[in-house]
């Protein structure tokens, strides 16, 4: 019931053009870049990390819509939560915050299993369990997860947002129609074109180094995704 209430609140906010509160779990390069775009689009954002004091410079430069806090504070704050952490830390987030995340309207999973950081055995295990997406759903039971922004470099986001001409496409994967709709709206607001490539099982393809990695138009993403099913 709480999750439905959250989704109803978000639906009303989007219908009336009201901002959504967004919590960023992991305000490193990717989380910081995405959060910055959301602030510039008019949404209040709480950035979080293990050491929120280190985020003072980031939030000071973004003005009154940005604040820093702990991971728990960012999750409590957000109608929408963006998780941009080393993938090996996802289990820890699930153990501590799965209940709270299940009550959100949308959880955007930006995290990727990367061998050089998380270890080759860990990445192999994620693959054997169906890949990122299905594993995130297992670790965050009940959360309305959409994988997105998994394969565009953080340093490129600001320059690609709202680019002239055809927008850059962002492949997304999810199983919750309402969460997908919220994600699509937010992605368009910050200057990209969302492309639903399938359910969370397709999340295994939304990582760097795959055909869907890198920068593509929406039409190119649809063509590539069609060859992967």
Language model: regions and residue ranges:
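Active-site-lining helix/loop region of Rossmann-like oxidoreductase modules
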Residues: 167-229
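General beta-strand structural signal in soluble alpha/beta enzymes
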Residues: 68, 144-148, 195-199
């Amino acid at each position: 019931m709480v999750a439905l209430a959250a989704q109803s609140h978000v639906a009303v906010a989007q219908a009336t053009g009201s901002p959504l509160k967004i919590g960023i779990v992991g305000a490193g390069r990717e989380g910081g870049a995405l959060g910055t775009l959301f602030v510039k689009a008019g949404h209040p954002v709480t950035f979080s990390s293990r050491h929120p004091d280190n985020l003072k410079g980031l939030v000071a430069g973004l003005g009154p819509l940005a604040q820093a806090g702990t991971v728990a504070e960012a999750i409590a704050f957000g109608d929408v939560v963006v998780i941009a952490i080393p993938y090996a830390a996802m289990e820890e987030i699930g153990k501590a915050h799965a209940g709270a995340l299940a009550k959100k309207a949308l959880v955007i999973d930006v995290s990727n299993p990367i061998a050089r950081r998380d270890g080759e055995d860990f990445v192999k295990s994620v693959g054997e369990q169906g890949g990122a997406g299905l594993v995130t759903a297992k670790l965050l039971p009940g959360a309305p997860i959409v994988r997105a922004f998994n394969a565009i470099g953080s340093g490129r986001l600001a320059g690609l947002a709202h680019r002239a001409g055809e927008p850059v496409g962002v492949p997304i994967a999810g199983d919750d129609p309402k969460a997908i709709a919220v994600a699509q709206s937010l992605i368009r607001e910050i200057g990209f074109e969302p492309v639903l490539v399938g359910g969370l099982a397709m999340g295994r393809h939304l990582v760097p180094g795959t055909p869907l990695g890198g920068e593509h138009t929406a039409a190119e993403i649809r063509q590539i995704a069609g060859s992967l099913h």
